Regions:
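Conserved beta-strand hairpin/beta-sheet module of binuclear metal-dependent hydrolase folds
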Residues: 10-61, 178-191
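C-terminal regulatory/interaction regions
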Residues: 257-323
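Divalent metal-coordination and catalytic microenvironments
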Residues: 15, 34, 44, 59, ...
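Divalent-metal (often Zn2+) His-rich catalytic cores of metallo-beta-lactamase-fold enzymes
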Residues: 181, 187, 209-271
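Metallo-beta-lactamase
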Residues: 11, 109-168, 184, 214
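Ligand/cofactor pocket segment of small-molecule handling proteins
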Residues: 153-217
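Active-site metal-binding motif and surrounding structural segment of the metallo-beta-lactamase
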Residues: 38-40, 50-96, 220
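Active-site neighborhood of phospho(di)ester-bond hydrolases with catalytic His/Asp-centered motifs
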Residues: 43-45, 69-77, 95-97, 169, ...
Length: 323
């Protein structure tokens, strides 16, 4: 189930709004605003400052106090499309898991800006894929504002009369993924544990942590806000779980048969999951699974992984032109 393809700031429960971009592909992430009794919490910021500024303007229109003060900013994980806008949020309290805080330093915004510049005139499959994935964002002049407070496993915070549960389920997508659950409103923000109508990608793993997180989300039967894509419910979590169960099983069969990552990727039939956006992420995912299985021949270089995904993407979009 997904709740339409709305965009902008959407109210999903009393005092809870979700920021939804036009689509949930590379870098186009969701965020949230939780408000009660003049207190506010923002869940994640966006990939660049202009986008975050627009989002905060809309949030301030609905909850005017956001313009001057936000009680808590929570980053669900360390990917830049969920934290690059932190500096624009008027708050002194930024919370994440310990692992997320540590991971934020691994790919600074300046490195992304340099990567985009490097491939501006590159007409190779890798260059075209980098422009497709990241060319629509402005990574200049971002100063990373990192967490002031960290936790492991679980933490509870209060916004007004709302008790909010912060639940660490990583490592999975990244090293420190966190869910944000508001029991009294029946709403959960999943970060990138859920991609809806798009293919998830596993930077960290293990996959069993991700599967367990999906089971946990589904069991809550809450209004479910994914990191990317439309708002969903338990069925969305089950679909992502089923993707990982399928891919783990199919990859293990081919690993046991001695196939390389590249050959396994081209041999696996995604079935219904082939219709999900960014299906080329199968390469990164199988590579991560092979690492779990103990392969010594996995790709560790991120640019090489993007080159492999770009080659698959080119084959699927050979008649399209980007940027």
């Amino acid at each position: 189930m997904s709740i339409g393809q709305k965009q902008g700031l959407v109210e999903v429960a009393d005092g809870i709004h979700v920021w939804l971009p036009a689509d949930g592909s590379w870098g186009w992430s969701n965020a949230g605003l939780i408000a009660d009794n003049d207190q506010t919490m923002i869940v994640d910021t966006l990939f660049d400052l202009p986008l975050t500024k627009i989002m905060l303007g809309e949030m301030g229109r609905v909850i005017p106090t956001v313009k001057e003060h936000v009680d808590i900013l929570l980053n669900t994980h360390a990917n830049g499309d969920h934290c690059h806008g932190n500096e624009l949020v008027p708050t002194s309290r930024i919370i994440s898991s310990v692992a997320t805080a540590d991971e934020m330093s691994e790919l600074p915004p300046a490195a992304l800006a340099a990567m985009v510049r490097r491939f501006e005139e590159d007409d190779s499959p890798l260059g075209r894929y980098i422009k497709h994935a990241f060319g629509g964002f402005n990574f200049l002049d971002i100063t990373m504002k990192t967490p002031t407070e960290t936790f492991t496993k679980n933490m509870s915070v209060t916004i007004g009369d709302l008790e909010i549960e912060l639940i660490e389920v990583g490592p999975a997508h990244t090293k420190g993924d966190v869910l944000v659950y508001v029991p009294s409103r029946g709403v959960i923000f999943t970060g990138d544990i859920l991609f809806i109508e798009g293919t998830p990608l596993m930077w960290a793993g293990p996959v069993d942590n991700w599967i367990a997180a999906c089971d946990r989300i589904a069991s809550l039967e809450a209004v479910t806000v994914p990191g990317h894509g439309p708002i969903t419910g338990s069925s969305g979590a089950i679909a992502v779980r089923d993707y990982w169960v399928m891919l783990k099983n199919e990859a293990k069969i081919r690993f046991d048969d001695g196939m390389s990552v590249r050959d396994a990727v081209r041999d696996i039939d995604l079935g219904a999951f082939a219709d999900w956006g960014e299906s080329e992420r199968i390469y990164l995912n199988v590579n991560s699974l092979y690492r779990e299985f103990g392969s010594s021949e996995v790709v560790e270089d991120v640019m090489e992984l993007f080159a492999e995904m770009g080659e698959i993407w080119e084959g699927e979009h050979e008649n399209e032109k980007y940027f």
